[in-house]
Amino acid sequence: MNEQDLLNSLRRDLNLPNLGKSHDGSEAVESTFPEKKESSLSAQQPHVDDQRSSLLSLLNAGLNASNQSPSNSGPKYYASHSSSTDALLQAFRDGAKPSGTASGADVKRSDSESTEATSNERPFNPVSAANLERLLMSSTGPQTPINGELKSNDSQDTAFQSSRNMPSDTSVASPDYSHSQSSSPIANYQESGNSEEPHKAEEQQQLSIYQLDNPGSGNYVWETVISPDKFETSTFAKCERNDIAIINRELDAQDNQLIHTNEDFIAYAVHREPIIRVIEISTGKSFLLHNNSPNKFVSVAWGNDSVIKNRLMAIDTTGQVLIFAVDIATSTSEIIFQLSGAQSLSDPIKSRFHWYPKSSTRFAVALSKHIIFFDLDLLNNISFPIPRSINAIQQLPCFLIDTGISAKEYDFSYDGTVFATVDKDALIKIYTVPTTFPSTPDKRPVPSEVSPIAIFTTRMERGPSKNYEKPINLRFISTPGTNNSRYLVIVYVMNQLITLFDLYSKRNIQTFRFNNRPTAATTTSFSQFSVDNERSTLLVGNPPSNSIYFFLFAKDETVSEQAPIYNSTYELILASLNTSEPVPADAKFSVIVAKKFEKAACISFTACKILESEDKYCIVVSNTDGYEYYSIPTSILDKTGKTVRSLESVQNYDADIGGTIDLTERHSTASPSTVNSGFSTPRSQATGFSKKKKDKGERFETKDKSSSVLSPSSYSASTFDAIPMDSIVSNILASLEKSVHKNYESLRSQLLEYKAANEKHTEAILSVVSSTLTENTGKILESVVEKSMQVALKEEIANSVRNALKNNLEKIESFLENSIAELQNSVREDFDKQTSSLAQLRYSIQNVAHAQKESEVKYNELNEQVKTLEGYVETVLEKFNDLKIENKVPETAPDVVPSSYPPAAESNVSVSSDTSTKDVEKQEPSSAEQPAQGIAESLRRLKEYVKAGSVKECVAEWCNMPSVAGFDVLSEISYDRMLENCSNLLLLTFIYHISLLDSVDDDRLSKRMEYISRICLNIDVNDPKVETVVHPVLTLTREALLRQSEFFSPIFKRRLVVLLRALDGKISEISVASSN
């Protein structure tokens, strides 16, 4: 059967007139064909009516209408779907969730955001539906169409909105994955890639490996200039790039480390939402962590303890720090630490968080110039959130360090013995890592008195070279085979300059400068900087060129022979300070591998261990299209035995070589920002760089100190309860003081009046006594009288004051007793109410949990019964079909599809004939129903074609005599082989017949829908051989599937929705092409 016969047969089945002239030049007879009578298929299934005649007019009317007035919204909506094969196939599989999986939240599409799916350059690796569920974690799509409209599943709560399919906000019940070859879904997805891709990728990426020739050391700095525009970079191969989540986002300077992994979990922040998704790598199970405020998260980090692996740190846009304890088994989490965010301008906004090395219990948080160290085991009885005030934090079990000036960043050494800070003046301060956390301020040193053990600087200018860039980040790194972190990598603004500082030789030994074209900042470079200490690899991103660079130490290089092997970084630094002789530094970066990200702008990245393989180097990346992970063969990063390009490095004798600053050094010309720390930087002198901007933390230092006493954030919860009582007592004491003073003045005035009234009588008595007694006796008597009067006056005054105080104190005592009694009663009543409410809530939760467990048990029992019944039904149907074929009963054979029409050559009816419709209907078919012998013969030929690999002949044979048994034989041919070997016309005929096939069991229905989706996505609508039939065939296929959907299971109804979208998109594409 040639293509012209195939086209005529298809047009005859569709009741379309044949064309007068075929596209290949052969003549074709124009004819019309009558409607066929209902076949056995229609007799057995009355709900699937063969309405070709009525459908034909409907299709023609719809096609004409679409050609005259094409819709503006339809083609635009489906254009993105039809342009990406992989995206539609992924969405098609998303509907096939395994039994027992909870449906996710309904996802709404934003009109303002891009609707384009993943790049069609991404690899399509077919995996099982279970693994796809675990890989993509996508929510369920819309339900079965009702009256031509797609209805969303309103029974589920919406977790968040996104322009892409987002993960569900409910815990996914883990299905049975025992059939999968690997326990890790991501490993399955990676291993299913094209085996030819890695070899090609390695050949291409070999061009982007550079070797630096910089032997020896001296009084100079090895300097390398990298021009990304001219630098040879290679893109990641398809087999190296895989999606974790697809989320459209815009660049935000606040975004930092948006995704992080450990050996067990993946965590990433959802764009514009206060949500973090946590995924278990081994099972693919995931659930959501919610912020207790409406602010999105900008940084996440797992603790790196080898035992406690479920603690996740998160920071939001206000600087709030949260630590979650994740329980993936129960899909629950607990906040075990919370430091509140900034509430005013006086509060430091930025929070810089670091876990202790190899710990999930101890960590440090930097707020402006303060660094606070905590231990979670000592914070069990602390109420959260913790205020963002240093005064409040000092009351907690912690350790504080005042760096004197706002440190840009800090980092722990890999062995955890020291940590380093770097500020805007390029000062590197080395401190010992605290191991004790006193509970009160009097048990710990004053934060400003904690001194560093060493201070280094990268700015010791020589000659005309003046480096005015401000450092923004630093990381420790060690050479392969050593236990200490000998080197510091300092990064300047936008990663334009990278300096390698040797702590042992106390100077800069190597610099890299990126020579980018002047462009606006595309994204923050703070997060595009990472160190993999286990592989001694530095990862640096270059935002203007959207590329990443791997810096590696040479494999054959070890620590300098002049430097003994120290067991810790602390010992190395002490030995460095005690060494006055110059020490050569010969261990430098010797290999650079340059890679480039495609399209989506990179935001952050970090090394990970998603793949448990020593042969692959993995990183996770967040970009403007979502989250991905990349795996690079370690053989590419190993330059041994390979020819790589050479990159020029020069010996710069005028570069900043750096050095050590004496801890006892003081400079009178130091700037105010450095006076607080007790040190002066080389730049702070008159000839140094100008200080045009004050540090942000210093600008509000005075205001913070003056307002901290009155600020609400400076009080704890217990202090707030004591404020009303303090005010009452102070008011009472003030009134008491006024009353005592008033009584004292009154008594004093009375005594003066009494003395004045009796003064005359006293003088008369004294004169008589003095005249009658001797002089001495009179003086003695006068003294006795005076003392008696003084005693009497003092006793009278004391009694008056005592009585006044007694009355006032009794009033105060009674008032306090009444107030305290009322307060106790009110607190007791509130406590009783809260206790009863909590008891009722606990009882309700227990009832709900019990009911949920019962419903789950019932659901599992019903599910097992349904599966058993389905197995019985399938067994009976198979036996029934086998019996029908063996008995050779043509009248009841359901395998014959009601699409067998007489061939075009046997019809003598033409378009120009005047034969009436009744005469056409009276014509008998040229051939009778096919006998069972014909079906058996067709099955024999199909098996021979399949065995011989004749794909085209096999499909043509089945289209000539379609049957269910023949479809089972035909389904052994893979989709890709069928698409490669069959023409568009043959494929179109094939999907027409399988859409009318009378079989709705799960296996055959799944294969039918897969064939239709594949052919729909790959058919060329511009092929002139099918341009007259492609629209009716696709429309008829769509209507046939809708009529049969009544007997579909819920799973296949969801898959049908996605398939109908693909058909509608292709039909809209045809309409747009015809209108143009």
From Swiss-Prot:
Gene3D superfamilies documented for this protein: YVTN repeat-like/Quinoprotein amine dehydrogenase (2.130.10.10)
Regions of compositional bias (Low complexity) in chain numbering: 1-19, 53-69, 174-184
Primary localization: cytoplasm
Recorded family membership: Belongs to the WD repeat EDC4 family.
Renumbered residue ranges of the record's region Disordered: 1-82, 95-127, 139-204, 666-714, 892-934
Name of the featured protein: Enhancer of mRNA-decapping protein 4-like protein pdc1
Cellular localization per UniProt: Cytoplasm, P-body
Gene from which this protein is expressed: pdc1
The organism of origin for this protein: Schizosaccharomyces pombe (strain 972 / ATCC 24843) (Fission yeast)
Per-repeat ranges for WD: 292-334, 402-441
InterPro entries named in the record: Beta-prop_EDC4L (IPR055393), EDC4-like (IPR045152), Pdc1_Ge1 (IPR054301), WD40/YVTN_repeat-like_dom_sf (IPR015943), WD40_repeat_dom_sf (IPR036322)
